[in-house]
Amino acid sequence: MGRLISVSFGLLVVFLSLSGTGADQDCLPGWSSHEGHCYKVFNLDKTWEDAEKFCTEQANSGHLVSIDSKKEANFVAELVSQNIKETRRTDFVWIGLRAEDKRQHCSSEWSDGSSINYQNWIEAESKKCLGLEKQTRYRKWVNLNCGQPYRFTCEI
């Protein structure tokens, strides 16, 4: 009886260690998991508005990516670098931040409604939408014309 309990306990430990946290299982096929969120780079050229709309159609809580820490910024940069297909339009990738008023100031939140807790600007210009720039290995944010079509990353 003692041996059966020992074997059962051993199998339980193995099962739990193999199952992990389950974070990867929560993501849709083709999406990448990072700290409880799922991300996917789309090799489609869309304006900022159309990219945001596309992301919201992927899942209930989908939006253009919001970057809340240097760790997340590095994860997103690597994901974009590994998944972007090279074309003329790959110099920039949309993120979920844009100016919301006529003075071109950024809103106080990302397109998903979360607060801006981390910033990594290259420069301030008079354009309204923000993206990641290839020249910085997709690690810096740059102001872009919202009507230009670029690739994008969604987060759910």
From Swiss-Prot:
Domain C-type lectin: residue ranges: 34-155
Tissue specificity field: Expressed by the venom gland.
Pfam families documented for this protein: Lectin_C
Signal peptide: 1-23
Localization per record: Secreted
Alphabetic keyword roster: Disulfide bond, Hemostasis impairing toxin, Secreted, Signal, Toxin
GO CC annotation: extracellular region
SMART domains assigned to the protein according to its UniProt record, in alphabetical order: CLECT
Methyltransferase listed as a keyword: no
Recorded superkingdom: Eukaryota
GO molecular function: toxin activity
SS bond partners: C27-C38, C55-C154, C129-C146
PROSITE patterns linked to this entry: C_TYPE_LECTIN_1 (PS00615), C_TYPE_LECTIN_2 (PS50041)
Gene3D superfamilies: Mannose-Binding Protein A, subunit A
Presence of the UniProt keyword Secreted in the record: yes
Miscellaneous notes: Shows greater sequence similarity to the alpha than beta subunits compared to other heterodimer snaclecs.
Family, as annotated: Belongs to the snaclec family.
Subunit composition and interactions: Heterodimer; disulfide-linked.
Function comment: Interferes with one step of hemostasis (modulation of platelet aggregation, or coagulation cascade, for example).
Protein name: Snaclec A2
Natural source organism: Macrovipera lebetinus (Levantine viper)
